[in-house]
A protein has these predicted regions:
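Hydrophobic/aromatic-rich, well-ordered segments within soluble, folded domains that form packed cores
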Residues: 24-45, 173, 177-196, 561, ...
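Active-site-surrounding "flap" and adjacent substrate/cofactor-binding loops of secreted or lumenal enzymes
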Residues: 30-33, 38-102
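Short, solvent-exposed loop/turn elements at domain surfaces
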Residues: 43-47, 167-168, 481
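Short secondary-structure subsegments characteristic of cysteine-rich extracellular domains
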Residues: 52-74, 205-222, 492-498, 591, ...
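Short, Gly/Pro- and small/polar-rich lid/capping loops
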Residues: 14-23
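Noncatalytic, helix-rich "gating/capping" subdomain that lines the substrate-entry/channel surface
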Residues: 77-367, 371
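Intrinsically disordered, low-complexity linker/terminal regions across diverse proteins
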Residues: 63, 212, 247-250, 269-273, ...
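Gram-negative bacterial Sec-dependent N-terminal signal peptides
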Residues: 1-13
C-alpha cells in the first residue's frame, strides 16, 4: 500500500470547535496517577447518575440525543396516514404504548387466550408450542436461528443453541456469592409474582416458580460458559435431521420445524449438544404441569413490558432494579418509543436518515476508514511476530473488508406487518415480533444477503461481522463526541477513528482471526503464528483479569478478550493514521494540549460514565466488553505514545514497564 492513499481530515486551527472541553477534566488528579479520572472526572462529577440509569456516559448521551430526535420525528408524524403506511404503523404502535389507561383497564386480558392454549397442551403438543414461542415471543429450553453457515458463508444454515435461562447466564444459577444468591432469590419471587398477575392462584404460582427454577437450573448445569462460547470450532456440530431425531427422540422435530414454517431443513448445526441433550431428557422427565408452567411463564415474562403497570413494575424490579441497580423506570414515552424503534427498525431508520443524516458525514467517514485501513495494513506488514505467509493472508482479508456507512442501500419491507389499534398493545407487538422471526427463518434455503444490515441507522453503535467480513457504522454514531467534521483531527481520530480501528481489529481478534476474507471459518494461520498470537493474547487478558472491579470480583480477561484486543488494536491503528495527518505530524497545541494529548483525551472522553455497583457486577458476568475505566486505563498502558504524550515515567501508577507492554496489532 502506498502512503499516497492516505487522505487527511485536517482543518485549520482557526476554524475548529473547542478541541478539549476542560470541564471534563479532574485536574486534582495527575494523568500518571489515574488517567481515566484525570480525563473524565469533571464530566462524572457534573453528570451524577440519574436514577433511571444503571450506567450513563457520553455514549448514552449520544443515544439520548438519538432518542430525542426519534421522539420529535414520531410526534410530528400526525395521525392522518393511510392505513398500512409506515407512518401509520410507527405512530399507532408508539401511541398504544402511551395509553396507560387502556393498558391498565385490560390488565392480563391480552394473555388469557394464549395461556389457555398452552394449558390445554398434552405432552404431544409441547414441541409445536416451543416452536410457536420461538417465533419471536420467547426462548424456552433452547434457541434456534438461521444464519450464514460458519464454513460456507454464502449459504444459510439452521442452528440450535443453548437457552431457556430467564436470568441470561448460567452463573446466576450455579454460583453462591451473596450478590448471586440475592439475584436468584429475587428471580424466583418474580416468577411467582408474574404468574399470579397472569391469573395463577397463590399456591399454584409458588409451585410453578419452583418448577421453573428447577428446569432453568438443570439447563444452566450443562450450559457452556461464555468463555467456552468464544471458540466457534467447538460449536460447529452438523447433524442431519435423521441424526437429530435419533439422538434427541423426545423432541418432536417434525412438529418443531413445522411450527416454524420450515419444511426444507436438511441439516442442523447443534452448537451445544449437551444442552439439547438435557432438553431431550427434560421432555421425558417433566410432568405435564411442570412443562406447561414453564412455557406459560416464558410467555408471560416476554409479554410483561407490554401490559398493565403491575406487570411492567414487576419486570423493572427484577431486571432493572435488582440486576442493574436502577432506581426508577424510564418515562413512558422512552419505553413506548423503543418498541417501534426495535420492531420496525429500518422503517424508523428510513425516516431518521432523511431528516438527520448529512450526506457529507458519509464522505468524511469514507476518508477516515480508508486512512485506518492503510494504517492497519502497515501494522500487519511490520509485525515482528508474524510470518510472511500469514501476513499475506491477513492483508488479503483486510483489503476484502466491506464497509457500510450511515444506512442501507435497500430498506426492509414491512407491508406484511399489521398494526391495528383495535387490538391490544401486546397482540400488535406479538405480531411484529412474529413477523421478524418468520423473516429470519425464511432465509433458510436462500443465499446469504450480504447487503442486509445487522443494526439500524439510528443505533449508536458499530459492528464487525466475521461471516460477511464487513464493518458497519450506523448514522447515529456519526455525531459528537464520536465524530464531528468541525473538530480537529486529534479529536476525531481519538474517538470515531478508534471505533473504526476497533471494528477492523475484530477481524483479527481471538474469534475473527478464525475466519477468512470470504467469511468462512478457515484456519489461514501457520501453527507457529497461531501460538504466538495466543501467547500475546493471554498476556493482554492477564492485564485485565488482574483488575478488581468491585468487592473481590475481578474482571474476566478471557471473556472480554475480543473486545480488549479490538480496543488495543483500534488505539494503535488510529494513532498511526492520525500521525500521517498534517496536524498529527506537527506539535501545535490547541487549548493548551498537544495533538497527542488531545488524541488520548478524546479517546478517554468516549468512555466517561457513572455506573452502579450492581451494573458493574452484572456486566462483568454477561458483557464481553470491559468496563469503561478499564477500556481506558488498561488499554492505553500498552502504548509508548501515551506515556510520551503525558510525560509518564517509572514510579507513576499508570506506568507499565516496556517489557510488560503488549503489542498484537
Amino acid at each position: 500500500m502506498s502512503l499516497a492513499l492516505v487522505s487527511s481530515m485536517a482543518v485549520s486551527a482557526g476554524n475548529l470547535e473547542k478541541a478539549v472541553d476542560r470541564s471534563n477534566l479532574d485536574t486534582s488528579v495527575a494523568p500518571g496517577e489515574n488517567f481515566y479520572q484525570y480525563a473524565c472526572g469533571g464530566w462524572m462529577k457534573a453528570n451524577p447518575l440519574d436514577p433511571q440509569y444503571a450506567r450513563f456516559g457520553t455514549f448514552d448521551q449520544l443515544a439520548e440525543n438519538s432518542r430525542e430526535q426519534l421522539k420529535n420525528l414520531i410526534m410530528n408524524l400526525g395521525d392522518n396516514h393511510a392505513k398500512g403506511s409506515i407512518e401509520q404503523k410507527v405512530n399507532d404502535l408508539f401511541k398504544m404504548g402511551l395509553d396507560s389507561v387502556r393498558l391498565n383497564r385490560e390488565g392480563n386480558a391480552p394473555l388469557k387466550a394464549d395461556i389457555a392454549k398452552i394449558q390445554q397442551l398434552g405432552r404431544n403438543g409441547a414441541s409445536a408450542a416451543i416452536a410457536w414461542l420461538h417465533n419471536g415471543i420467547a426462548n424456552p429450553f433452547f434457541e434456534s436461528a438461521v444464519m450464514a453457515d460458519l464454513k460456507n458463508s454464502s449459504v444459510n444454515l439452521f442452528y440450535l443453541c443453548q437457552g431457556g435461562l430467564g436470568l441470561g447466564d448460567r452463573d446466576y444459577y450455579l454460583e453462591n456469592d451473596a450478590n448471586t444468591v440475592k439475584v436468584r432469590n429475587a428471580y424466583a419471587k418474580y416468577v411467582e409474582q408474574v404468574l399470579k398477575l397472569a391469573g395463577y392462584k397463590g399456591g399454584d404460582a409458588k409451585k410453578a416458580s419452583a418448577s421453573v427454577m428447577k428446569i432453568e437450573t438443570e439447563l444452566a448445569r450443562v450450559a457452556m460458559s461464555r468463555e467456552e462460547q468464544r471458540d466457534y470450532s467447538k460449536q460447529y456440530n452438523i447433524y442431519t435431521v435423521a441424526q437429530l431425531k435419533s439422538d434427541y427422540p423426545n423432541i418432536d422435530w417434525d412438529a418443531y420445524f413445522g411450527g416454524l414454517g420450515l419444511n426444507n431443513v436438511d441439516k442442523v448445526c447443534v452448537m451445544q449438544p449437551k444442552s439439547i441433550a438435557k432438553v431431550n431428557e427434560l421432555m421425558k422427565s417433566l410432568n405435564d404441569k411442570e412443562l406447561r408452567d414453564y412455557l406459560v411463564f416464558n410467555y408471560v415474562s416476554s409479554a410483561a413490558n407490554y401490559l398493565s403497570d403491575d406487570f411492567v413494575q414487576a419486570d423493572f424490579d427484577m431486571f432493572s432494579k435488582t440486576l442493574s441497580g436502577k432506581k426508577t423506570m424510564q418515562p413512558r414515552w422512552k419505553r413506548s418509543l423503543s418498541v417501534p424503534n426495535n420492531l420496525l427498525g429500518e422503517a424508523v431508520g428510513q425516516l431518521y436518515v432523511a431528516k438527520y443524516f448529512p450526506p457529507e458525514s458519509k464522505k468524511k467517514m469514507q476518508e477516515l476508514v480508508n486512512n485506518l485501513r492503510v494504517a492497519l495494513g502497515e501494522h500487519i506488514a511490520n509485525l515482528s511476530w508474524m510470518s510472511p505467509k500469514t501476513k499475506v493472508n491477513a492483508l488479503v482479508k483486510l483489503n476484502s473488508f466491506t464497509v457500510k456507512i450511515g444506512y442501507p442501500d435497500k430498506w426492509r419491507d414491512y407491508s406484511a406487518v399489521s398494526i391495528d389499534a383495535a387490538n391490544s398493545y401486546w397482540d400488535n407487538v406479538k405480531g411484529a415480533k412474529q413477523f421478524e422471526a418468520q423473516f429470519q427463518y425464511s432465509q433458510l434455503g436462500k443465499p446469504v444477503d450480504k447487503d442486509r444490515w445487522q443494526m439500524t441507522p439510528q443505533t449508536v453503535n458499530a459492528y464487525y461481522d466475521p461471516s460477511t467480513n464487513e464493518i458497519c457504522f450506523p448514522a447515529a454514531i456519526l455525531q459528537p463526541p464520536y465524530f464531528d467534521p468541525k473538530a480537529d483531527d486529534a479529536s476525531n481520530y481519538g474517538a470515531i477513528g478508534v471505533v473504526i480501528g476497533h471494528e477492523m481489529t475484530h477481524g483479527f481478534d481471538d474469534q475473527g482471526r478464525n475466519f477468512d476474507q470470504n467469511g468462512n471459518m478457515v484456519d489461514w494461520w501457520t501453527a507457529d503464528d497461531a501460538a504466538k498470537f495466543q501467547k500475546l493474547a493471554d498476556r493482554l487478558g492477564a492485564q485485565y483479569s488482574a483488575v478488581v472491579v468491585a468487592d473481590t470480583v475481578h474482571a474476566n480477561g478471557q471473556f472480554t478478550m475480543g473486545e480488549n484486543i479490538a480496543d488495543h488494536g483500534g488505539l494503535r491503528v488510529s494513532y498511526s493514521a492520525f500521525k500521517k495527518t498534517e496536524q498529527g505530524k506537527g506539535n501545535t497545541p490547541i487549548d493548551g494540549f498537544t495533538p497527542d494529548q488531545r488524541f488520548y483525551l478524546s479517546y478517554a472522553n468516549v468512555w466517561a460514565a457513572n455506573i452502579t455497583k450492581e451494573e458493574i457486577l452484572r456486566r462483568t458476568k454477561i458483557d464481553p466488553h470491559s468496563l469503561g475505566v478499564n477500556r481506558v486505563n488498561v488499554a492505553i498502558r500498552n502504548l509508548d505514545s501515551f506515556f510520551n504524550a503525558f510525560g509518564i515515567k517509572a514510579g507513576d501508577k499508570m506506568y507499565r514497564e516496556p517489557a510488560d507492554r503488549v503489542i498484537i496489532w
